[in-house]
Amino acid sequence: GYSAESPVERAYRDSRINRIFEGTNEINRMLTVDMLLKRAMKGQLDLMGPAQAVAAELMGIPDMPEPDDSLLGDEKRMVANFKKAVLMVAGGAAQKLGLELAKHQETLMHIADMVIDTYLAESVLLRTLKLASMKGDSGSVAGMTEQVAMTQLYIHDAADRIHKYAKEAVNNFADGDEQRAMLMGAKRFCKSTNLNTAELRKLVAKKVIAEGKYCY
């Protein structure tokens, strides 16, 4: 216990509120995938169709898309592939486990983390592209070099995280040839281009230091 007359009372109370928020976030994290799969099974959401299309793509010869020279072209491709990774893992888990998936909480958490990182990556990408278009040229980085750098850093970091979540989820429910195929798919869909992250982080930090505050 603690005394309400003590200044520490406010700190204890605020800390307790933060724990409530964190608990709610964890519950929502578990419910994210469960809700998507339930809607898919009820026919309210076409999840299996795209998932099967991704599975068919894995069985085919990898295509060699034309290079996208537009602003953040590589990152656009990466985000599109993140979505394929989510569909592959979620669809595979749903087909293998069915309604039993609800009992596999670690697998659900890995898929939920994939969904969350993919959502954030796309949000960051679209926000940066919108800023560029507001400047009158969606292909220009003039005046927003740091924003582009932060977008690249986030999406490239997300690729490693999503790959990790995908591998752990697949290893939890698949085996044999299916496991090998899905692990190869995870590696393929989470592939990132070579990026000098040290220089990009220095670029962002230099701007913040010069401004003396968070300036984005």
Kindly label every feature range from the protein language model.
Residues 1-216:
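Flavin-dependent oxidoreductase catalytic core characteristic
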